[in-house]
Amino acid sequence: MRRGAYTPRSTPFPRDRRSYNAGKGRSFRSYRRRGPVRPLARRNLFGDDHARAFTYKTLSEDQFGPDFTIHNNNYKSSYISMPVKTRALSDNRVGDYIKLVNISFTGTVCIKNSQMESDGSPMLGLHGLFTCVLVRDKTPRIYSATEPLIPFPQLFGSINASYADLSIQDPYKDRFTVIRQVSYPVNTEKGDHMCRFKGTRRFGGRYPIWTSFKDDGGSGDSSGLYSNTYKNAILVYYVWLSDVSSQLEMYCKYVTRYIG
């Protein structure tokens, strides 16, 4: 084997090692960004709680009592109260708008036959249909001084419309939308009957529902009442249809989940 001087192989690349080693051994500090580094997000050092309080919250409301007593072939109109603008930690809102997440409700109705036998004893037998319907009012406004909410027959055509799936009348379709309807038939030979009802409605998807409020600074009204709602109030109608003279008493609990 021959020993002697090493002869490198020919290569098309330049033999200048300085170009190959350029950049090697250079200090990492030379690549550091010059000047101060700004934070990724602005920080309020003086405690603005508005953004922090805009979180998921829950509001409960019970509807019952003499105002919710319904006679046969009649209805009761109401609405779901929205949160009040306060600095409380729960059941409130921090701005003049909220985003509705879902509304669930559970309740009980007690129906009694009002007719009497010839001997003065209560007449037996109850037959009818109870309906609870939730309606979205896109632009709330008081209907009249005596009846603030739009009447059920005017909105749906007649009170007997609750025998089927409810549909808004043409003149009001741009303003109102049915968002939930539950119906329970009653058919018993007894003189009284009690049943439970429930339902839920989730909001979201491509078209979420944002409820905004007037919050007039002059009058100091920052409530969740229908009169203070600027857009997207939720109306409720209870209907009891029966050919038997009867009276319905009810209790209903609403749970509204929202961001606000």
UniProtKB/Swiss-Prot annotation:
It is a peripheral membrane protein. Pfam families: Gemini_coat. A motif (Nuclear localization signal) lies at residues 84-100. GO terms for cellular component: host cell; host cell cytoplasm; host cell nucleus; host cell plasma membrane; membrane; viral capsid. Keywords: DNA-binding, Host cell membrane, Host cytoplasm, Host membrane, Host nucleus, Host-virus interaction, Membrane, Transport, Viral movement protein. Binds to the genomic viral ssDNA, shuttles it into and out of the cell nucleus. Begomoviruses use 2 proteins to transport their DNA from cell to cell. The nuclear shuttle protein (NSP) shuttles it between nucleus and cytoplasm and the movement protein (MP) probably transports the DNA-NSP complex to the cell periphery and facilitates movement across the cell wall. Binds to single-stranded and double-stranded viral DNA. Interacts with the host nuclear shuttle interacting (NSI) protein. This interaction may allow NSP to recruit NSI monomers to the viral genome and thus regulate nuclear export of viral genome by NSP. Belongs to the begomovirus nuclear shuttle protein family. This is Nuclear shuttle protein. The lineage of its organism: Viruses, Monodnaviria, Shotokuvirae, Cressdnaviricota, Repensiviricetes.
